Structure formats: structure tokens, C-alpha cells
């Protein structure tokens, strides 16, 4: 019922095994990665390196829930190179960014091709709302998903809506057509007026309401923990995750 996924920062855990060890310490079965690990693009890694990584995933009992692709989605050769190694590692989803496009429709055309490539490997393609991007509001996300077609899922990041002084639950989620399309809920909270992050439940991002309604709708995605404060220590991460789990217990 509760899938906890963490994206360990390079500041806290620079190496792949260190990231898996951090997952162990905080009790998360799912790990999120960038497509660049210790300076090397995942799609460029050789078979021996990928096999070693796969062995570590088995040893630690972890699953890669998400890989963030940092390249351009129009570069399908690079994207497909990432897909091949991601598939071998058992990754469940890849997130792409839609920067560099003038319209959502233009981004959707390239995203659609990436989504079909990913589908061939049994991998979901994900997009995430970001307050400083083309996909700032829920209607932008809806348009991209509708235009790009199947195998495109969303990552709902409430703090980005809070930074725009929009209520993530009442303004963005409640009337959304993407309620059943959410693959990840970012566990993030922040304050409208100061535009700064806060612990879950202490800001205006309505994280408790979002988690509650998703669970009531049989949410099968991941609650995703990220270093949204910036350079969080191990103690900070513990406090952050504990705060959210406390909210869950209060529901």
C-alpha cells in the first residue's frame, strides 16, 4: 500500500552503492537516480558496470523506481541508449524534461516518440510539473499527456504549485483529469509568502490532503522523497521522512 521512494542527493551519497545504503537506512525499497552517475552517463556504461550495479540492487533488495533523463527528448539515440541499460537494471520509469520548447504541443510530439520507445521496454515515461517550466500548471500537464498519447504518466510536485501561490489540492488536483495518471507524489511542502520549503505538514502545499485522497483512490504509485531543501544532512532526511510518516498515521 505504501511505496516509499527516495532520490539520494550526490551531496549525501555520491556513489551508487552509497545511494542504496542510504535507502536501507531510511527504510525505502525504491531508489531514484539521475542518468549521470559519478560523472558517467548511464547509457554509456559498459556491460560489466551495469552487471555490477544489477548485482548491488539484488544484494540490497532495491528497485530503481525512476531515472531522470537530463538530455533533450529530441535526441532519441541517446534516450534509447539509456533505455537499454535502464531495462537491464529493472527500472520502472524514466522522467524527461520539456525545456527548450515554445509550446506544450511541440514538446508532446517528441515526448510521444519517447513514450513509445519506453513502452517497448516496459518502462513508463514520466513528466513533472515545475513552476519555472513549460509544465507549470495542471492544465499544461493535461494537454501534454492528452497530446502525447499512452504510456505518459505524471509526477505531482505540490511545492511548485505552492511557490506560484496556487493551492495544490484545491486549485490543481481536485479538478484534474490526471488523478489516475499520477505515478509519483513528491513529498514536498513550502510556504506561499516566503517561497521557501518546510517540513511536510508545516507549509501550504497540502501534502496531507493530497496523500489522503490518493490513498482513498487506491494509489499504487510512489511517495517520493527528494532533497528539496538543498544539501540535506542524514539527520535532516530522517526528520523529513518521519514527519511525512507521522502525517500518514494521522489519517
Name each model feature, range by range.
Residues 203-210, 217, 222-223:
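H/E-rich (His + Asp/Glu) clusters that bind or coordinate divalent metals
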